[in-house]
């Protein structure tokens, strides 16, 4: 039904709500935005979490010591859930995929581009588009799969690197979709 439930340790507010003893043994509902939006995808990072709502906005909560909440500030998300924003303060919209890699987060957008924020991008606390990365179909960790089957690694310098694939008997490089 699109409800996000969390429980466990809450030392960095990663549960998305306040707890009395820094933990919750019982699952409790996480409220996404003022309208309690339903989630379509979730991703867990290192003591922080992300969720894509039905509106295609991305919500984040938890530890923010490396800008991994992407909400434009350096504060931990104490109790609230915030939306991921661009540098100009507008919400990231059009999200169709999310992924985390340590304290860095990646958002796949409907137009085939990827937005990134967090530790591997100089602790950047807002989303920016990875330059040179287009026609992406899926993100996982800090890797991206293109529609043509190429695998790209996203790295600290904001320049994606093509990961070499397998070769056929004639030495021709095969895309991941042809393996």
For each of these PLM feature ranges, what is it?
Residues 1-179:
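Eukaryote-biased RCC1-like beta-propeller repeat architecture
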């Amino acid at each position: 039904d699109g409800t996000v439930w969390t429980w466990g340790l809450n030392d960095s507010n990663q549960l998305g709500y306040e707890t009395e003893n820094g933990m919750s043994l019982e699952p409790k509902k996480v409220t996404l935005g003022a309208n309690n939006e339903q989630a379509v995808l979730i991703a867990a990072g290192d003591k922080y979490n992300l969720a894509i709502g039905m509106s295609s906005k991305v919500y984040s909560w938890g530890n923010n010591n490396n800008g991994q909440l992407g909400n434009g500030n350096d504060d931990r998300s104490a109790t609230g859930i915030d939306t991921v924003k661009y540098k100009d303060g507008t919400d990231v919209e059009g999200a169709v995929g999310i992924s985390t890699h340590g304290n860095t987060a990646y958002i796949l957008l409907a137009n085939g581009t990827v937005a990134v924020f967090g530790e591997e991008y100089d602790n950047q606390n807002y989303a920016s588009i990875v330059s040179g990365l287009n026609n992406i179909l899926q993100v996982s960790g800090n890797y991206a799969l293109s529609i043509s089957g190429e695998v790209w690694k996203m790295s600290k310098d904001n320049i994606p690197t093509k990961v070499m694939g397998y070769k056929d008997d004639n030495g021709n490089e095969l895309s991941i979709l042809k393996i």
